[in-house]
From Swiss-Prot:
Residues at which Zn(2+) binds: 13, 16, 35, 38
One Gene Ontology cellular component: HslUV protease complex
Gene from which the chain derives: clpX
Domain ClpX-type ZB: 1-54
Alphabetical list of SUPFAM superfamilies matching this protein: Glucocorticoid receptor-like (DNA-binding domain), P-loop containing nucleoside triphosphate hydrolases
InterPro entries xrefs: AAA+_ATPase, ATP-dep_Clp_protease_ClpX, ATPase_AAA_core, Clp_ATPase_C, Clp_protease_ATP-bd_su_ClpX, ClpX_bact, P-loop_NTPase, Znf_CppX_C4
Domain of life: Bacteria
Keywords assigned: ATP-binding, Chaperone, Metal-binding, Nucleotide-binding, Zinc
Record family assignment: Belongs to the ClpX chaperone family.
Summary of subunit composition and partner proteins: Component of the ClpX-ClpP complex. Forms a hexameric ring that, in the presence of ATP, binds to fourteen ClpP subunits assembled into a disk-like structure with a central cavity, resembling the structure of eukaryotic proteasomes.
Name this protein carries in UniProt: ATP-dependent Clp protease ATP-binding subunit ClpX
Protein residues bound to ATP: 117-124
Organism: Brevibacillus brevis (strain 47 / JCM 6285 / NBRC 100599)
PROSITE patterns associated with the record: CLPX_ZB
One term of GO molecular function: ATP binding
Amino acid sequence: MFKFNDDKGQLKCSFCGKSQEQVRKLVAGPGVYICDECIELCNEIVQEELGTEEEIDMKEIPKPVEIRKILDDYVIGQDMAKKSLSVAVYNHYKRINSGAKIEDVELQKSNIMLIGPTGSGKTLLAQTLARILNVPFAIADATSLTEAGYVGEDVENILLKLIQAADYDVEKAEKGIIYIDEIDKVARKSENPSITRDVSGEGVQQALLKILEGTVASVPPQGGRKHPHQEFIQIDTSNILFICGGAFDGVEQIIKRRLGKKVIGFGADFGDGVKGDLKAGEYLKYILPEDLLKFGLIPEFVGRLPVLATLEPLDEETLVRILTEPKNSLVKQYQKLLSLDGVELEFDNGALLQIAKEAIKRNTGARGLRAIIEQIMLDMMYELPSREDVNKCVITEETVRDKVKPQLLTKEGQELHEETA
């Protein structure tokens, strides 16, 4: 350590050795001095070590309209779901900032249930919301959960994932978002309560009730099962937003029966303005909590998820828009990858439509688009880095449908003729 003064009696920083004239400010302590530059450096080191706590300020929470606009940049279609989520999320964080009480009125949590087919954007919506709000986010799979005391994961392990996402900052994690996927898989096998143990169905729903509503949970820091001789992380779940998602295959039949199965005549009215000639996927928008009870969720569980948002199956037009429009769309990602090798990539309209048709045929929704494009692009991504004569690669409808090689063009625009793949 440097002396705080030299032989001439000039004051110096005890850490870096700079004199009083060389710095803006020198702060005195008992027998030591520290300059403003060293204070700033120490502050940066402490912040890196401990992490900066980011309080969610009401002024910083985007309004529902703003949340919706940002969701539009990443998620195509699903307008009603985006509207419902924007309002629910805004109200949730407004509730946190108000201290959950306004003039002695207690504001209840508004956890969300997302219902829609595979690949319709449930997980992406939840991820994007967490990114917009800059809060910790964790995804859990309901199929891996079991009731306490049985082989499988305890529900508290869901909270551990959130704590890990917050770098073990519990206070930050307490304002995070947890997405529980495949929640329909924990429905009990029949509408009537079971006399036997249903450890991966009704038992899991019962175990989730407390953390959904809000409780101080004890979480094992290393995950796994609890045992008496270990320390626990205490986390209050009152302000954690839970979003549960599932495809709920078969619930449309339940809705259809409720609306009135025996309607005679094309275009007949079910009542309440609901037409009888609805297509598959269109019944979901008329879902009610009672339909979820018939599906196999217990009343207490449905009650903890008051916001119901449904997602529509994706048609060809929407899938084409998903391929091209979002900020991080698949087409833009692959164009960027090839541009790093000096090759321009183009998908013609026929190719995009054919990719969308293939995804619908596979019944994978938007989730299957990457696998299809990866299959199409594999040979090109293998060959093109070594091809200095290629300036542009065009994926055509024939490339997707008939496995024909893409069009390869030189800088002069001349086509390089390739053999069929």
